Amino acid sequence: MTSLVKPQHYPELFRRYEGNPILTANDWPYPVHTVFNAGACQIGSTTLLLVRVEDRRGHSHLSVARSDDGISNWRIDAQPTFPPDPANYAEEAWGVEDARVTWVADRQEWIIAYTAFSPIGPLVSLASTVDFQSFIRLGPVMPPRG
């Protein structure tokens, strides 16, 4: 039998915050079932999370949470920030999930890669924003597997 041993030649890079989770469904200003992993960025001195939130039907949307220290005193948008739009984007019929946020200096805007989910399966889509209040959907960039 083998045992897992922490290698001694690698320094510890990260330590899990003892107060996790920093956000739960109870923190949301509207009824939700669960909150999941978020895309994160720093805007000035503010930490911004674009959080995957599952509603009580099991469909996901994205919601913005802001904090001055990235740990406490979160200010969460009163309504879903980036809800699915299946009337115009069929690939979002079952929700939008798992955002990743990147500042693109050449464009002077944030690009968001997210999972659009529908009966055809999950696929990667892009959107852009300058303020995390309004968004331009750029559409799918990777088709569903299969």
Regions found by a protein language model. Give the residues of each.
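Beta-rich carbohydrate-recognition and catalytic domains
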Residues: 1-94, 103-146
